[in-house]
Amino acid sequence: EGHRLEFKDKKNIKSELEIKGVVFNEMKGAMSSITSQLWHGMSRHLYSSSTYKHNSGGDPEEILDITHNDLVNFHKKHYHPSNATFFTFGKIDPTEIQEFIKTNVLSCFEPSSEKLGVQNEDRLSSPKIKSDFYNPLPGDEDNHHVVISWLLNESHNPVELLETYLMSNILLDNSASPLRKALESSSLGKSPSPLTGLEADQKELVFAAGLEGVSANKHQEVENLIVDCLKKLISEGIPKELVDSSLHQLEIRQREITGSGMPFGLQIMLTCLPACIHNDDPLNILDLDNAFNIIKERLEQDNYIESLIEKNLINNNHKLNYSLIPDTNFNKKNDDRIYEKIRNKTKNLTEDDKNKIIDLAQALETRQEAIDDPEALPKVTKEDIP
């Protein structure tokens, strides 16, 4: 349930109208997180032309404009089986599963010829500087958040993915890593930004580094701190032992079967998923031996990691300097905009319209409070188990 109108006094059409709804309230809660605001704000500017500029859960203010028809049509288009990827894992006959899916799912739909895909972001010709506002916690009224981010190569090329992970690990893996050390020891901020690191879950990789607890108008100094650290590494070189230890740790992490809170088969499926949805070979991403062998060969070249830093970061114009600026009235301004939107949407409601809102609210409450019939639950007997 996305959103609905409801009177503050559910039986009084003279009382104030409010917005209710599971999705609306969930996303208001989710977007109250400063880290979420930082990530979605950064993404909106870094991915200004592609699908990743949108908040996948829904911007609370925009949720108010969606209609039931909008939702149904979007679902029919984007969640059609023709746009799905089906995985099987384990010592089972895939033909049997595929026949089951065909009979019970695919046969219920007409094939769709529309091919949906995520386009690569249009690349910037020059870096951007952008800022937004957030509501600070008590005591943090002067804390600015500054993040410098770069859009890199595609995430489903196994060699490029691993070498970018290696670059990131060398720079940020622990407090002795050069870029993390520079951030943690800087007086410009209190601590590294929670967005610091490599984001590999989208079609194109994002590398970010920054600080929280920064003073006003220090965003350029934060960028200079990061860029100067990177340039120093390029000019002075990265110690071989740091590269070797980072590569060793990366190999262990990539090969280790940890469970990670989920079955190993599901881990494999999720690893393959980006290549599947972006029309690449999913088995390539699992070929770790070949990818690591290529990287080890490249590491025999002089300044291999330094050249990666130079290409991916120093000479990369798709760079964003993004700040979140504290504003103690930010939440109130948001609430005022939502209130004004509600007022504009409801100012022409008739008395019949208002009574219908009361009737619908009562019907929903009755349904929500109804006791579920346990007979509706399926029963499994011993005879059902093969």
Residues covered by each model-derived region:
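Extended, domain-scale alpha-helical bundle/helix-rich regions
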Residues: D287, I294-K341
